[in-house]
Amino acid sequence: MRKLILFILTTALTLPGFGQAIDRFNPDTIKTIELDSNVKITARKFGIETFINAIVTDETFYQAFRNMKKYTFTAENRIYTYDKKNQVEGKIYRKIRHNNDGPYKMEYLAKEDAGKLFKKNGKYQLYTVEMFDYIFMNPYNSDLLTEGPMTTGAKGKGANEGYKDKLKTLIFSPGRPIKGLPFIGDKTQIFTANMRQYYDYSYDSGVYLDSIPVYRFKVAIKKDISSGTKDDLMIKSLVTIFDKRNFAILGRYVDMKYSNMLFDFDVQMNIEMTYFGEEKLPTKITYQGNWDYPFKKEERASFLIVHKDYHLGKGK
């Protein structure tokens, strides 16, 4: 149970211009968006419902990750683990060339480890780091990026396939319910009529990567509701970046925090994308998170993933 919930929240992905809620070292110093003003959208067929519908129906984020398999690119991966005082305890750095010019090859250009990272048996101390390594170190082999339509954990599938569907829903389609996720599956469904009463909605206008005009649509818990109600809402804020020219989603940030008698977590995640030719591809993924589970070592970690130098693999 612990691994199921931790795996899902570790991998639920996730924009600068948002301060991190956890007060400690932040590896992400890359600023990609400049906001200029609040926006009032007055068109009759364009407003909050337009943004919400785009968020809950979008599958282009998922497709963008799958499209990586056609490209050669360089990935720089940085992982940091922390002690109880939020001082850096361990560091991992990988610079990897994902070479898709011919049969796929993963080439390490740099590989550095420092601090407390491994158990005596050679495995990572933290499950967070283990999951990072499984999913992002080699995205070509990740089970999350299989072909086929998105689902929410349909009946009739094997345990592993249903589990992957849950992960995909939380990562790529926030706002949808996640069937079969213990304790928190219904708390992701923030756009129902009942849940909307607890959230405020705001729009901003800005420029992304110095040239792309964007809207920033933010959903955040209302300030005037009771502390007990706030504590029971898992998603504290959800921010989505839309390209004004075609309404494509280029970025997504989610802040989640929840506590009960079985587990306690505080997680902020971010995913950003940009265009390479006509293709939308991932360029930055960040994570800051604390996990506490009875009788287990508390997990504190952050990571920064940067993808660059994409080019279409030969013959793809």
Segment roles from a protein language model:
Residues 17, 44, 252:
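Surface loops and adjacent helix of pleckstrin homology
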Residues 188-194, 203, 212-315:
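Gly/Pro-enriched, hydrophobic low-complexity segments
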Residues 15, 19, 61, 262-263, ...:
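Alpha-helix boundary/interfacial micro-motifs
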Residues 1-29:
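Bacterial Sec-dependent N-terminal signal peptides
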Residues 21-213, 221-228, 299-316:
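Structured extracytoplasmic
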Residues 2, 11-16, 130-133, 211-215:
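Solvent-exposed, well-ordered amphipathic alpha-helical segments
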